[in-house]
Swiss-Prot record:
Annotated source species: Lactococcus lactis subsp. cremoris (strain MG1363)
GO CC, one annotated term: cytoplasm
Protein name: Elongation factor Ts
Pfam families named in the record: EF_TS (PF00889)
Matches recorded under PANTHER family: ELONGATION FACTOR TS, ELONGATION FACTOR TS, MITOCHONDRIAL
Biological classification of the source: Bacteria, Bacillati, Bacillota, Bacilli, Lactobacillales
Keyword Signal: no
Amino acid sequence: MAVTAAQVKELREKTGAGIMDAKRALVETDGNMEAAAELLREKGIAKAAKKADRVAAEGLTGIAVNGNVAALVELNSETDFVAKNDQFVALVKETAELLAASKPANNEEALAIKTASGVTLEQELVQATATIGEKITFRRFVVIEKTDAQHFGAYQHNGGKIGVISVIEGADETLAKQVSMHIAAMNPTVLSADELDSEFVKAELAQMNHKIDEDNASRVLVNKPELPHHEYGSKSQLTEEVLAAAKASFEEELKAEGKPEKIWDKILPGKMAKFIVDNTKVDQQFALLAQLYIMDDSKTVEAFLESKGAKAIAFTRFEVGEGIEKAETDFAAEVEAAKAGL
């Protein structure tokens, strides 16, 4: 039977299929709109299944705030080109809004959420895989709740490649967003240094000192003084005994320099503060509150917030593709393979 342009247009609007796919489906189903739509869905699932073993490591983060609930999600695509596709961008936005509204507990519950079109989120992702032409993956999400006295800091960087939600108490949304900007830039992994495992601290400290050794090897070649190792890496290692020993050492230095004892109390606090900064480098790398605030690096994030009567409660930071092993592609080999398949 003859298929009209109006029928093709209607089917495309309903399914998102391409012109030729829509026309073929209508021809195969004798113009039955519902049957054609079902046929396209079936073909879409089949196409999506073929793409299931591809690595999807590009994509976007999405953020949605719904009153005292916020959601952060990461959807992946295979290429950065598709990540900028309007349909993909809209899908990420819709997914974040659904998560904030439904507050699912895990990925299984999230994928079972009904979308505005009546299908589940999982089905919508399958359809998107078919129509966009790349594997679309729902990777991870978090739902964060706050009280009326707290504020969300929602921030996305680099077009959504990094997404951050923070919860700040005793501040306003502007300050909360600034903290999230800091988190996006400095990539802390925990809120407080108290959350860092002692073995982790030891391993990271060893890695830092190894890097110093490498730097010193280069410095020697150009007659620069060698940098000292960090003896400690976290405030958890700075016991009362360690701090007392450091203070005693500084007192000996001041005495040897001939500094009058009556002015020591003015000098020692600065030396002790520097000692703590120099020996909490692991904390500063991984713990938000211990990091120097990027908008005022004379203070840690914790000290800056305290100066504003505020307190950081929680945060989550997603960076697209982190932890996903990307396949190495050989463009020339792909071209030859494509030629062979012609």
